[in-house]
């Protein structure tokens, strides 16, 4: 399908890159231009980790998301240019066109639902339902275009399951859960300037490198498809990060977290590298597992779990969840004890007028790093977390191209 003139890059990718660079300029320009509009609409808030009471525009992910969509809407004809010349195209590749449109529909739905969350401040149960609904077009595209639900079984399990295993509907459940996880994973690992956009930028850069390496492989078309989305996403996110970096002049909002997560889910599923995609999310997976006791309210969870600012030192310190000891269930007590023994949490107990109370640090990767390294300046904490994301990507490439031999025949 992708038979284009010999260029350093295929023509559609070159057009995509040029459009993405224009998208970077547009994002950098539009965000300050719309600042007053968001503040007038009361889509603004204060940075809780700053002494300043200045109002900062929120939900700016809707701007980078809109620029991203405009780039790709204008780009739609270019992968199919050969079909405009009759002798170069025997039949129009409808399945590839459907994949492109279906992917854009899923991302567009997620941007809309994310913005609705920012405006309406939805509950957590809704945050799980929204990505599920937005992923349905994606699953239908996979069903109509591919429909393959058979996986290659890793070597250690082949003596039980055989070489191949057809998961059937469970494979679609897995893809739906992947979309839900990706959209919420970035949202959970958030709360300091530049972190949401920064981690997304590192992940997208890692995927771009992975796609470029795989262009010489057997699945060239899938990785070109992924690049069509990742290159514009990288540059629009870079424009957003320019304004969101410490000290942040804008907040990205849940809109960006959902937009980023669904974009990653789209390329992972339709690009057929969902396992590699999950490896790029190692810090987010750890943060999710570490946060589970609070997310399921086994251990009391405050509305905001971001670290707190020490006004005297100007550094961030761990934030805590304080609750009555008698209100903690047996399971919560057990989890807290195990986590304390593993030095994953700091627990304080004491007495107050209301009786015995327990206090533990909020269970996020951000607070865990503050527990390990002590109080850190916000900018340095963001850099530390992004360094961890880069190391995670390096580990992913090592697993994907070296350790994979232990599990699969490559």
From Swiss-Prot:
Superkingdom as given in the UniProt entry: Eukaryota
Where does the UniProt annotation locate this protein? Endoplasmic reticulum membrane
Q: What is this protein called?
A: UDP-N-acetylglucosamine--dolichyl-phosphate N-acetylglucosaminephosphotransferase
Q: What does this protein do?
A: UDP-N-acetylglucosamine--dolichyl-phosphate N-acetylglucosaminephosphotransferase that operates in the biosynthetic pathway of dolichol-linked oligosaccharides, the glycan precursors employed in protein asparagine (N)-glycosylation. The assembly of dolichol-linked oligosaccharides begins on the cytosolic side of the endoplasmic reticulum membrane and finishes in its lumen. The sequential addition of sugars to dolichol pyrophosphate produces dolichol-linked oligosaccharides containing fourteen sugars, including two GlcNAcs, nine mannoses and three glucoses.
* Source organism (scientific name): Mus musculus
- Enumerate the residues binding UDP-N-acetyl-alpha-D-glucosamine: 46-48, 58, 193, 303-305
Q: Which residues lie on this side of the membrane: Lumenal?
A: 1-10, 81-93, 146-168, 216-220, 272-273, 403-410
Segments crossing the lipid bilayer: 11-40, 61-80, 94-120, 124-145, 169-188, 195-215, 221-244, 253-271, 274-295, 378-402
- Where does the UniProt entry place glycosylation sites? 148
Disruption of the gene: reported phenotype: Mice die 4 to 5 days post-fertilization, just after implantation, suggesting that protein function and N-glycosylation are essential in early embryogenesis.
Q: Provide the residue positions that the database annotates as binding dolichyl phosphate.
A: 127, 180-188
* Gene Ontology terms, MF aspect: glycosyltransferase activity; metal ion binding; UDP-N-acetylglucosamine-dolichyl-phosphate N-acetylglucosaminephosphotransferase activity; UDP-N-acetylglucosamine-lysosomal-enzyme N-acetylglucosaminephosphotransferase activity
Query: What modulates its activity?
Result: Inhibited by natural nucleoside antibiotic tunicamycin, which acts as a structural analog and competitor of UDP-GlcNAc.
What's in the GO CC field?
endoplasmic reticulum membrane; Golgi apparatus
User: What does the UniProt keyword field contain?
Assistant: Endoplasmic reticulum, Glycoprotein, Glycosyltransferase, Magnesium, Membrane, Metal-binding, Transferase, Transmembrane, Transmembrane helix
What reaction gets catalysed by this protein?
a di-trans,poly-cis-dolichyl phosphate + UDP-N-acetyl-alpha-D-glucosamine = an N-acetyl-alpha-D-glucosaminyl-diphospho-di-trans,poly-cis-dolichol + UMP
UniProt record similarity statement: Belongs to the glycosyltransferase 4 family.
